[in-house]
């Protein structure tokens, strides 16, 4: 059905008037009116005007039209919700644990360290008894590489840090958040790496995509003329006591010798402690290590520990019975010596009697000691008789 055409002579309803006609309906000086609320009220349509729209007769060819609905007002944007606090960063867990077992391989790979004492002024010192390196933060730590025969060309040396304790060995060793934000980068090392190589522009810092572990790799260089070993200078860029990092957990540094394809040629490791006073900490730990070794001495071969009686562990142990029941005859020259030794003997007998009373706590045992003391008195008389004879050798 075709829609009837509108007659141009018919005036359109109010809702379709032009903007100029609507502007004329506004009260004068509405913009500069001191009462803006009253001017806004004048703009509001009265109920009579609305009723007039509905009762107005439309033209012959035009149906009454309803006023167009006002466009929907977009809802006011909600106030931005406060951002939730970022969760604490969780350290990534490694899917594999590198081996720390010493493996010299066919080239006799091993490590060496410079000899240094335990003075407070040292910045790096190694303890052979503990196989542990004590060093300060970001200080030079020379590590010597020894081989019996030269490895093939393209050999590399990799250094990696892992936690020593089994409950933390799967965690990746990295710097604490505070030291990560420090501006001490040399342009090559990522800020989260703990181990760096000093004075080597060929160092490569690796982040394994599978294990997430950090390592630094340098090409192996043969010893210089007149030297028997190759020295690499490492730096440790975080303290062992830093919260959020190692957090006082002991770590190991694993040094591996690899060929150009990554095949293992040798492996060695040592423990590391990064602290403020390496000499003092080394001296303290070595003393504790020696004390622990002295408190648990090794038993000789074939020795058997004798089990203690389960009766009274707190009471003093009695002497061996064969020694208590044996009697000896002693020939003494001179009465003065005899009286002195007799008093000593009586004092010892009295001491044994008092010890027996404390352990047993019975009169029967004390009477036995008195009878034993009487026997010793008769023995003294016998000794006195012998002293009257000729002197003996």
From Swiss-Prot:
Required for interaction with FBXO42 as annotated region, ranges: 113-236
Region of interest (Interaction with USP7), ranges: 357-383
Chain positions of cross-link Glycyl lysine isopeptide (Lys-Gly) (interchain with G-Cter in ubiquitin): 24, 291-292, 351, 357
Segments of this protein annotated with the region Interaction with WWOX: 66-110
Chain positions found as Phosphoserine: 9, 15, 20, 33, 37, 46, 183, 269, 315, 392
Binding site residues for Zn(2+): 176, 179, 238, 242
Cofactor list: Zn(2+)
Cross-link Glycyl lysine isopeptide (Lys-Gly) (interchain with G-Cter in SUMO) placement: 386
Modified residues (N6-lactoyllysine): 120, 139
Region (Oligomerization): 325-356
Required for interaction with ZNF385A, as annotated region: 100-300
UniProt PTM: Phosphorylation on Ser residues mediates transcriptional activation. Phosphorylation at Ser-9 by HIPK4 increases repression activity on BIRC5 promoter. Phosphorylated on Thr-18 by VRK1, which may prevent the interaction with MDM2. Phosphorylated on Ser-20 by CHEK2 in response to DNA damage, which prevents ubiquitination by MDM2. Phosphorylated on Ser-20 by PLK3 in response to reactive oxygen species (ROS), promoting p53/TP53-mediated apoptosis. Phosphorylated on Thr-55 by TAF1 which promotes MDM2-mediated TP53 degradation. Monomethylated at Lys-372 by SETD7, leading to stabilization and increased transcriptional activation. Monomethylated at Lys-370 by SMYD2, leading to decreased DNA-binding activity and subsequent transcriptional regulation activity. Lys-372 monomethylation prevents interaction with SMYD2 and subsequent monomethylation at Lys-370. Dimethylated at Lys-373 by EHMT1 and EHMT2. Monomethylated at Lys-382 by KMT5A, promoting interaction with L3MBTL1 and leading to repress transcriptional activity.
Post-translational modification N6-acetyllysine, affected residues: 120, 305, 321, 373, 382
Matching Gene3D superfamilies: 2.60.40.720, 6.10.50.20, p53-like tetramerisation domain
Entry keyword annotation includes Protease: no
Residue positions of motif Bipartite nuclear localization signal: 305-321
Region (Disordered): 50-96, 283-325, 354-393
Summary of subunit composition and partner proteins: Forms homodimers and homotetramers. Binds DNA as a homotetramer. Interacts with AXIN1. Probably part of a complex consisting of TP53, HIPK2 and AXIN1. Interacts with histone acetyltransferases EP300 and methyltransferases HRMT1L2 and CARM1, and recruits them to promoters. Interacts (via C-terminus) with TAF1; when TAF1 is part of the TFIID complex. Interacts with ING4; this interaction may be indirect. Found in a complex with CABLES1 and TP73. Interacts with HIPK1, HIPK2, and TP53INP1. Interacts with WWOX. Interacts with USP7 and SYVN1. Interacts with HSP90AB1.
Disease: p53 is found in increased amounts in a wide variety of transformed cells. p53 is frequently mutated or inactivated in many types of cancer.
Family named by the database record: Belongs to the p53 family.
Protein name (Swiss-Prot/TrEMBL): Cellular tumor antigen p53
């Amino acid at each position: 059905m075709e829609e009837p055409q509108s007659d141009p002579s018919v005036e359109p309803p109010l809702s379709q008037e032009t903007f100029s006609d609507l502007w004329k309906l506004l009260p004068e000086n509405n913009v500069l009116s001191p009462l803006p609320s009253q001017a806004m009220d004048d703009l509001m349509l009265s109920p009579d005007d609305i009723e007039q729209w509905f009762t107005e007769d439309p033209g012959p060819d035009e149906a009454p039209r309803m006023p167009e609905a006002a466009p929907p007002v977009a809802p006011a944007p909600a106030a931005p919700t406060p951002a939730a606090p970022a969760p604490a960063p969780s350290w990534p867990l490694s899917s594999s644990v590198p081996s720390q077992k010493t493996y010299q391989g066919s080239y006799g790979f091993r490590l060496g360290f410079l000899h240094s004492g335990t003075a407070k002024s040292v910045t790096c010192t190694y303890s052979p008894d503990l196989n542990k390196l004590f060093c300060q933060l970001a200080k030079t730590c020379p590590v010597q590489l020894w081989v019996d025969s030269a490895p093939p060309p393209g050999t590399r040396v990799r250094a990696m840090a892992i936690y020593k304790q089994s409950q933390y060995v799967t965690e990746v060793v990295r710097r604490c958040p505070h030291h990560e934000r420090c501006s001490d980068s040399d342009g090559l090392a990522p800020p989260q790496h703990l181990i760096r190589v000093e004075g080597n522009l060929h160092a490569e810092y690796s982040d394994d995509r599978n294990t997430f572990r950090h390592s630094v790799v340098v090409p192996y260089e043969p010893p210089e003329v007149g030297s028997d070993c190759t020295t690499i200078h490492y730096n440790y860029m975080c303290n062992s006591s830093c919260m959020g990092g190692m957090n006082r957990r002991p770590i190991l540094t694993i040094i591996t010798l690899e060929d150009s394809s990554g095949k293992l040629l040798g492996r060695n490791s040592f423990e590391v402690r990064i602290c403020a006073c390496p000499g003092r900490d080394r001296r303290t730990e070595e003393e504790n290590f020696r004390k622990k070794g002295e408190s648990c001495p090794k038993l000789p071969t074939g020795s058997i520990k004798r089990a203690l009686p389960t009766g009274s562990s707190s009471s003093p142990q009695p002497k061996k019975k064969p020694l208590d029941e044996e009697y000896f005859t002693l020939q003494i020259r001179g009465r003065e010596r005899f009286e002195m030794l007799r008093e000593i003997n009586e004092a010892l007998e009295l001491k044994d009697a008092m010890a027996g009373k404390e352990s047993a706590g019975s009169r029967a045992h004390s009477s036995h000691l008195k009878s034993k003391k009487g026997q010793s008195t008769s023995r003294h008389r016998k000794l006195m008789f012998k002293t009257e004879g000729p002197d003996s050798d």
